Amino acid sequence: MATKKAGGSSRNGRDSAGRRLGVKKADGQYVIPGNIIVRQRGTKIHPGTNVGLGKDHTIFALIEGRVEFLTKRNHKIVNVKEIASA
């Protein structure tokens, strides 16, 4: 007969890897078409002019230019401003 009761096993001890979300291009940074500007879950930051919105709510550049973040009516918006050619 066993002199000790069987020890229970822990049911915790696992964790998922981070999803690498967040802002990928800062305000004023140069982008080309297709560059990812923000990776997010839901539209925390809304798309503005010259940016597209992917099915996973990723915001990406549609034109060459500089990134611009602004707030309008409590909504964060990201635009890409075209660089004036000399």
UniProtKB/Swiss-Prot annotation:
Gene encoding the protein: rpmA
Species, as recorded: Rickettsia felis (strain ATCC VR-1525 / URRWXCal2) (Rickettsia azadi)
Superkingdom: Bacteria
InterPro entries xrefs: Ribosomal_bL27, Ribosomal_bL27_CS
HAMAP family referenced in this protein's UniProt entry, alphabetically: Ribosomal_bL27
Record GO cellular component, one term: ribosome
Molecular function via GO: structural constituent of ribosome
Swiss-Prot/TrEMBL keywords: Ribonucleoprotein, Ribosomal protein
Protein name per its UniProtKB record: Large ribosomal subunit protein bL27
Protein's GO biological process: translation
Lineage per the UniProt record: Bacteria, Pseudomonadati, Pseudomonadota, Alphaproteobacteria, Rickettsiales
